[in-house]
């Protein structure tokens, strides 16, 4: 039985968002070739939910002419930094991070990731001891984009110090004939899984799945 819901804690729930309550602007603009910080938080706690969307998808209803660019799922890089670290713990294309590795949008959901109504979500618990920063880099050579994002987090001064930090590793390859190493990691931690996307060099030809694949 999960009795945590009945336990008194010092947690406070807060939200980081691109919505500006003064201007009523919902998004931040990320021109091609630029990096923008979505937000930065100081304190001890954990992220419990990340939700993000782009023009022409979730909010196409109030902005019908908004262009739709699925390539932005590969060219927009998401980075998350923990505790003032110089290197990001998360660095991956937004599509791959949320489980859409081939830029083909489709609704799905599992325990930790999913896409619904044009928005992407991640519910992995992500602890931090001193704070976090989230930024995005637009590496697209043609497309500027807007981002609408909400990050739900809990500040908890009593957070267990013996917890791991959430990390990702992104790898990609083409024309592979040898075994492909998805990641090589050393240190204490848990491997929680991967999102694997494959596509044949001949589009819409699934014959490459006829060969034995080993993981």
Cite the ranges covered by each PLM segment:
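Beta-strand-centric surfaces of beta-sandwich/beta-rich domains
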Residues: 1-215
């Amino acid at each position: 039985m999960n009795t945590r819901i009945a336990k008194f804690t010092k947690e406070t729930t807060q939200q980081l968002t691109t919505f500006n309550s003064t201007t009523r602007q919902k998004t931040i603009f990320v021109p091609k070739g630029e990096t923008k910080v979505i937000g930065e938080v100081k304190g001890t706690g954990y992220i419990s939910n990340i939700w993000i969307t782009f023009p022409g998808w979730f909010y196409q209803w109030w902005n019908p002419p908004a262009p739709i660019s699925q390539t932005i799922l590969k060219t927009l890089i998401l980075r998350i930094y923990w505790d003032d670290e110089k290197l990001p713990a998360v660095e991956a294309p937004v599509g791959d991070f949320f489980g859409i590795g081939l830029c083909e949008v489709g609704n799905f959901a599992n325990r930790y990731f999913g896409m619904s109504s044009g928005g992407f979500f991640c519910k992995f618990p992500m602890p931090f001891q001193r704070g976090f920063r989230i930024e995005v880099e637009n590496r697209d050579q043609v497309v500027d984009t807007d981002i609408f994002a909400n990050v739900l987090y809990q500040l908890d001064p009593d957070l267990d110090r013996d917890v791991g930090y959430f990390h990702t590793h992104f790898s990609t390859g083409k024309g592979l004939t040898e075994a492909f190493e998805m990641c090589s990691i050393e240190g204490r931690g848990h491997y929680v899984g991967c999102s694997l996307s494959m596509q044949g060099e001949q589009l819409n030809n699934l014959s490459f799945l006829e060969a034995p694949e080993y993981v």
